[in-house]
Amino acid sequence: KKRVEYMKSKNLNVINVIEKNKPKYDFIYSDQTFEHIGDPKDTLELLNSSLNLGGYILLNFPSSFGFKRKIKNNYTPSKDEAHPLEHLNLFNRSSMNYLIRNTKLKLINFRSLNSLKLRDMYKDIKNLIYFDSVLLKKTI
């Protein structure tokens, strides 16, 4: 909200692409954007309000695999999960469950590097190393 107000103060036209009373969707896809959002819970609730009952949200974001170990070992930014520094959030199964708490969304699938079998790693090596994904379903 602060950023929106700042942009408006600079005479920039700010458009909210998801507004109330707009069409509902069966599927919403977000690729490499959620880690940049300052308030992912509010954004997720906004996306949820734009879903039909039984609709899905698919989110892809950088993997946080191994990041906890990095910050325990005198972490300095380099090109990784949290850098460039505009990556405001990292997600894992636990943080995603926290985000969807008290929403009408159910976590259907969480694919992460540390949950894959070795034989699956060869299917799409780039995405397996760098990106996790979560599939959510609107249930009520």
Which residue ranges define each predicted feature?
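Conserved SAM-binding loop
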Residues: K1-N73, L85-N102, L136-K138
